[in-house]
Design a protein with these regions (language model features):
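An alpha-helical support segment within catalytic cores of ATP-dependent transferases
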Residues: 1-26
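Inter-domain helical "communication" segments and dimerization helices
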Residues: 1-6, 72, 78, 96-103
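Extended, well-ordered alpha-helical scaffold segments
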Residues: 2-9, 78-83, 131-142
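Active-site activation/catalytic loop segments of kinase-like enzymes and analogous catalytic loops
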Residues: 56-95, 110-128
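Helical subdomain adjoining the active site within ATP-dependent kinase catalytic cores
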Residues: 96-108, 113-147
Length: 147
């Protein structure tokens, strides 16, 4: 990634990845894969599903949601906060996962989502692209909260 701070934080993500409990994850949980009607939501397109660390799908959903109503993945901060709390209260708490550990782990999985686009930008020499710049800025801002 050519950034010492990001590489250090990413190394911590990799360390966590190997120790986090696994579960069935969608692994492409983005708004276009959630159909909502009559107060119910159905998740579709399970082709990338796998047994992965538990925060994988939630991190993808939250990392790519934007508060701009014209954004491809619109999601308010209130929606994100609700999803984070609901996931803990209804799935993790009963399995003995500590809330602070959950939030720390989720933060590193969010970092991964940002770094994925950074690594692709570096690999394909597209570091000047709008997408690279957006996710690089998100990652740099996000690692401040990891300290």
């Amino acid at each position: 990634m050519n950034d010492a701070d990001l590489e250090h934080a990413y190394a911590e993500y990799l360390r966590l990845y190997s120790s986090v409990p696994r579960t069935l994850c969608h692994d492409d949980l983005l708004p276009f894969n959630v159909l909502c009607a009559n107060g119910h939501a159905t998740i579709i397109d399970w082709e990338y599903a796998a047994i992965l660390p538990y925060p994988t799908s939630l991190a993808r959903l939250i990392a790519h949601g934007e508060e701009d109503e014209s954004a491809f993945f619109y999601m308010t901060q209130a929606d994100k906060d609700y999803a984070i709390e609901y996931y803990f209260e209804h799935l993790l708490k009963e399995n003995g996962i500590d809330y602070n550990d959950y939030r720390r782990t989720l933060d590193y999985f969010l970092l991964y989502e940002y770094c994925e686009w950074i690594m692709l930008g570096v690999k394909y020499n597209e570091t000047g692209s709008e997408r690279f710049q957006k996710y690089y800025a998100k990652a740099k801002e996000h690692i401040k909260s990891l300290a």
